[in-house]
């Protein structure tokens, strides 16, 4: 299955006065992302502030993105949680919606399952629905790391098609790529590791930076794929300050700040996250402006 090279982990537009998921702003953002380099979108993931979205808000978000997308980009819905039964029920509900190409299922957080528990969790979710499953390994947030051996075992299941790897461990990522089939998708979950992961055989990136430099991310991908590694490396180096700047305070506050500054109204972040202060915003804007110099 081809989900594309640059997949944007989409922020969730919130109405600034009503503090509600905003249909009009969703429509505008989806069109902006597709028109500016995104092959696919992850909806209601970490960058989409999934912990502070209600179930009903997530379903509203999915419906509106599906409607606006109209089949143009691949859509991946975040349905994971630390409750296996809840994840299964939510994934089934999303499957009935139509228009969703795959689900992103995060490693169960807080309850700290061992590798056997992680394996059983993903097997149960994958077997409960026909929607393809992308594993999300992010030990920095979930506390548990899905070991390469566990991912390699899971990759043998027909409905588990890939992994978003945010462990930052290139040795582990290389092992996964080497010991899974060619059609198992391995995506960088960190913008700054996109090029290194491509170099060891990865498929692309689930990106935050592509909200504002999606075309540049595509250019880097295309340069690498065409064999112009020097050009790809040059683009990577030029984008690195922005990639790091977007995580200077908790994500997605910096991304929302830049989008709002560019006229793509996505509103504020929800508590317990807070928006950038004036000093933080000025520094981030200077980084973005420095890319064109």
UniProtKB/Swiss-Prot annotation:
<dbReference type="GO" id="GO:0008840">
    <property type="term" value="F:4-hydroxy-tetrahydrodipicolinate synthase activity"/>
</dbReference>
<keyword id="KW-0220">Diaminopimelate biosynthesis</keyword>
<feature type="site" description="Part of a proton relay during catalysis">
    <location>
        <position position="110"/>
    </location>
</feature>
<feature type="binding site">
    <location>
        <position position="47"/>
    </location>
    <ligand>
        <name>pyruvate</name>
    </ligand>
</feature>
<keyword id="KW-0704">Schiff base</keyword>
<dbReference type="GO" id="GO:0009089">
    <property type="term" value="P:lysine biosynthetic process via diaminopimelate"/>
</dbReference>
<feature type="site" description="Part of a proton relay during catalysis">
    <location>
        <position position="46"/>
    </location>
</feature>
<comment type="function">
    <text>Catalyzes the condensation of (S)-aspartate-beta-semialdehyde [(S)-ASA] and pyruvate to 4-hydroxy-tetrahydrodipicolinate (HTPA).</text>
</comment>
<dbReference type="InterPro" id="IPR020624">
    <property type="entry name" value="Schiff_base-form_aldolases_CS"/>
</dbReference>
<feature type="active site" description="Proton donor/acceptor">
    <location>
        <position position="136"/>
    </location>
</feature>
<keyword id="KW-0456">Lyase</keyword>
<dbReference type="GO" id="GO:0005829">
    <property type="term" value="C:cytosol"/>
</dbReference>
<dbReference type="Pfam" id="PF00701">
    <property type="entry name" value="DHDPS"/>
</dbReference>
<protein>
    <recommendedName>
        <fullName>4-hydroxy-tetrahydrodipicolinate synthase</fullName>
        <ecNumber>4.3.3.7</ecNumber>
    </recommendedName>
</protein>
<dbReference type="InterPro" id="IPR020625">
    <property type="entry name" value="Schiff_base-form_aldolases_AS"/>
</dbReference>
<dbReference type="InterPro" id="IPR005263">
    <property type="entry name" value="DapA"/>
</dbReference>
<keyword id="KW-0963">Cytoplasm</keyword>
<comment type="subunit">
    <text>Homotetramer; dimer of dimers.</text>
</comment>
<dbReference type="InterPro" id="IPR013785">
    <property type="entry name" value="Aldolase_TIM"/>
</dbReference>
<comment type="pathway">
    <text>Amino-acid biosynthesis; L-lysine biosynthesis via DAP pathway; (S)-tetrahydrodipicolinate from L-aspartate: step 3/4.</text>
</comment>
<dbReference type="GO" id="GO:0019877">
    <property type="term" value="P:diaminopimelate biosynthetic process"/>
</dbReference>
<feature type="binding site">
    <location>
        <position position="206"/>
    </location>
    <ligand>
        <name>pyruvate</name>
    </ligand>
</feature>
<comment type="similarity">
    <text>Belongs to the DapA family.</text>
</comment>
<dbReference type="InterPro" id="IPR002220">
    <property type="entry name" value="DapA-like"/>
</dbReference>
<keyword id="KW-0028">Amino-acid biosynthesis</keyword>
<feature type="active site" description="Schiff-base intermediate with substrate">
    <location>
        <position position="164"/>
    </location>
</feature>
<keyword id="KW-0457">Lysine biosynthesis</keyword>
């Amino acid at each position: 299955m081809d989900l594309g090279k640059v997949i944007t982990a989409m922020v969730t537009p919130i109405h600034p006065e009503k503090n509600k998921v905003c249909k009009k702003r969703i429509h505008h953002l989806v069109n902006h992302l597709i028109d500016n380099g995104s092959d696919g979108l992850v909806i209601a993931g970490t960058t989409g502030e999934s912990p502070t979205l209600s179930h009903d808000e997530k379903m509203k978000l999915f419906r509106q993105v599906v409607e606006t997308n109209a089949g143009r980009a691949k859509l991946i819905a975040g349905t994971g949680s630390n409750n296996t039964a809840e994840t299964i029920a939510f994934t089934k509900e999303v499957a009935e919606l139509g228009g969703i190409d795959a689900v992103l299922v995060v490693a169960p957080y807080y309850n700290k399952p061992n590798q056997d528990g992680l394996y059983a969790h993903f097997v149960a979710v994958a077997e409960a629905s026909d929607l393809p499953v992308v594993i999300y390994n992010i030990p920095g947030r979930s506390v548990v790391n899905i070991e390469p051996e566990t991912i390699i075992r899971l990759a043998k299941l027909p409905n588990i098609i890939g992994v978003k790897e945010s462990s930052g461990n290139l040795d582990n990522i290389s092992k996964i790529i080497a010991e899974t089939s060619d059609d198992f998708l391995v995506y960088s979950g960190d913008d700054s590791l996109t090029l290194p992961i491509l170099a060891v055989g990865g498929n692309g990136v689930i990106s935050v930076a592509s909200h504002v430099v999606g075309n540049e991310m595509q250019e880097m991908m295309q340069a690498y794929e065409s064999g112009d590694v020097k050009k790809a490396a040059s683009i990577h180096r030029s984008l690195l300050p922005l990639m790091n700047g977007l995580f200077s305070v908790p994500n997605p506050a910096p991304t929302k700040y830049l989008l709002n500054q560019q006229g793509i109204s996505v509103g504020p972040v929800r508590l317990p996250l807070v928006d950038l202060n004036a000093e933080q915003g000025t520094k981030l804007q200077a980084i973005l402006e420095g890319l064109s110099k």
